[in-house]
């Protein structure tokens, strides 16, 4: 019989908020008796935007802005029904995007 696994992928712009949410998920899963692998840091995606500083002239004068998207991966191995219930009731921060695959 194959073992069950829940894969949770977290994304956020703030790395501290992301690590805090990952810690809450790990703590909840371990408390309910499941094994946890992670959080595994995935590569940070950096989107850069270059704009002209002046609205009219000076093409050489530019400014760059960037958005960093931090990602973490968690694997919950052999989850129990109690683990699933606890994860569904877990209230995470609004700035963290959670994707769950089973």
UniProtKB/Swiss-Prot annotation:
Q: Which species expresses this protein natively?
A: Myxococcus xanthus (strain DK1622)
Which protein are we looking at?
Small ribosomal subunit protein uS10
Q: Which GO terms describe its biological process?
A: translation
A Pfam family found in this protein is Ribosomal_S10
Which protein family is named in the record? Belongs to the universal ribosomal protein uS10 family.
Q: Which gene encodes it?
A: rpsJ
Q: What keywords are annotated for this sequence in UniProt?
A: Ribonucleoprotein, Ribosomal protein
Q: How does it assemble?
A: Part of the 30S ribosomal subunit.
GO MF annotations for this entry? structural constituent of ribosome; tRNA binding
Cellular compartments per GO CC: ribonucleoprotein complex; ribosome
The protein's job, in short, is: Involved in the binding of tRNA to the ribosomes.
